[in-house]
Amino acid sequence: MRLLKNNIILRLLNSYMVDSPQPANLTYLWNFGSLLGICLVLQILTGCFLAMHFTPHAEMAFNSVEHIMRDVQSGWIVRYTHANVASFFFIFVYAHIGRGLYYNSYKSPRVLLWSIGVIILVLMMAIGFLGYVIPFGQMSLWGATVITNLLSAIPVFGQDIVELIWGGFSVSNATLNRFFSLHYILPFVLAALVVAHFMALHIHGSNNPNGVTSNTDRYPMYPYFIFKDLVTIFAFFWILSVIVFFYPNLMGHQDNYIPADPMVTPASIVPEWYLLPFYAILRSIPDKLLGVVAMFGSLLILLVLPLTDLSRIRGNQFRPAMKFFFWFFVVNFIMLFWLGSQHPNTPYLEIGQLSTTFYFSFFLVIVPFTGLVENTLLDLNIKELDLNL
């Protein structure tokens, strides 16, 4: 303990991981941060090992993945772990954001913390998309073609940007090299943002389920919350082991086991499951440019929440109306997952348009309007109490 407090580097670690005071009433919903940290470490480690055996060449990429699976000792475990932890990474980050939305963790003084988190989410999606292309299977090729083509909707410079990304006039060897290089380096940028996120959290500490200051009732991180985190970490490793060993392709796409063929178009071109809600928003708008704007806007709109939430109460646990709208939003978001996996035909297109409308209405209309109504009712109730006194 003396070493932890005297050494310059270890003293910093001690202040963040050992002596850091946490609210006494934190629930298991606050465990997603530690799970995400474990996922990031696993992804970087397994990714580095996979990169040692992968060949970023259009004619050899698919075979090099098969080489990892068949010839490299325990290569199949490393690859399936990397692929499935990526899915868990997004499951945990969606749950982490959902908890932040429910308990209003984006409100002052944690605006910087929330903003860095949104940037992390956008970067994660970019890294996930790049990784989806790297095996250069059939869905990798056509997914890359469709998604990168979206940038052609940008006026004047769109097509030039697409060809710059491709390194030619179609997805080719140059594209694969670009994507592999970015997929390798961006996780380290992500790790730097996670450190910044952690530092921003350390300034004001964690929010808590009651939404009020908890400075008078806090416990140190170790041993109380470290052991609490270990419960969910061990549960995660158990579930991950079951999936890796028994259902490794549960969250993957079977078309990616077919080598990339630019002459054969898959029956349905879809991105990885964790991008489906935003893909559904993109397809629900007929105009290409507006669809791209809506897709990116559906992510960046999270940044405006600290401005649009006008309620004086932190968290939805004491707000019945907002609690109803929040769970309706969750159901709507799950529906967008489903719609993103369907063909853009009737009735999926119309349902997608309704779901997209509600998605944006939640942030721009429902959240501020509900806050104003609650504030007005609160003021009227206070005045009535004053008159009665």
From Swiss-Prot:
Keyword vocabulary terms for this entry: Electron transport, Heme, Iron, Membrane, Metal-binding, Mitochondrion, Mitochondrion inner membrane, Respiratory chain, Transmembrane, Transmembrane helix, Transport, Ubiquinone
InterPro entries: Cyt_b/b6_C (IPR005798), Cyt_b/b6_C_sf (IPR036150), Cyt_b/b6_N (IPR005797), Cytb/b6-like_sf (IPR027387), Cytochrome_b (IPR030689), Cytochrome_b_C_euk/bac (IPR048260), Cytochrome_b_N_euk/bac (IPR048259), Di-haem_cyt_TM (IPR016174)
Positions contributing to a ubiquinone binding: 202
GO cellular component terms listed in the entry, alphabetical order: mitochondrial inner membrane; respiratory chain complex III
Domain of life: Eukaryota
GO molecular function: metal ion binding; ubiquinol-cytochrome-c reductase activity
Main localization category: mitochondrion
GO biological process, one term: mitochondrial electron transport, ubiquinol to cytochrome c
Subcellular location per the Swiss-Prot or TrEMBL entry: Mitochondrion inner membrane
Membrane topology: Multi-pass membrane protein
Signal peptide region: none
Residue ranges crossing the lipid bilayer per the database entry: 32-52, 76-98, 113-133, 179-199, 225-245, 289-309, 321-341, 348-368
Free-text function comment from the UniProt entry: Component of the ubiquinol-cytochrome c reductase complex (complex III or cytochrome b-c1 complex) that is part of the mitochondrial respiratory chain. The b-c1 complex mediates electron transfer from ubiquinol to cytochrome c. Contributes to the generation of a proton gradient across the mitochondrial membrane that is then used for ATP synthesis.
Family designation: Belongs to the cytochrome b family.
Record PANTHER family: CYTOCHROME B (PTHR19271:SF16)
Record's subunit section: Fungal cytochrome b-c1 complex contains 10 subunits; 3 respiratory subunits, 2 core proteins and 5 low-molecular weight proteins. Cytochrome b-c1 complex is a homodimer.
Protein name as catalogued: Cytochrome b
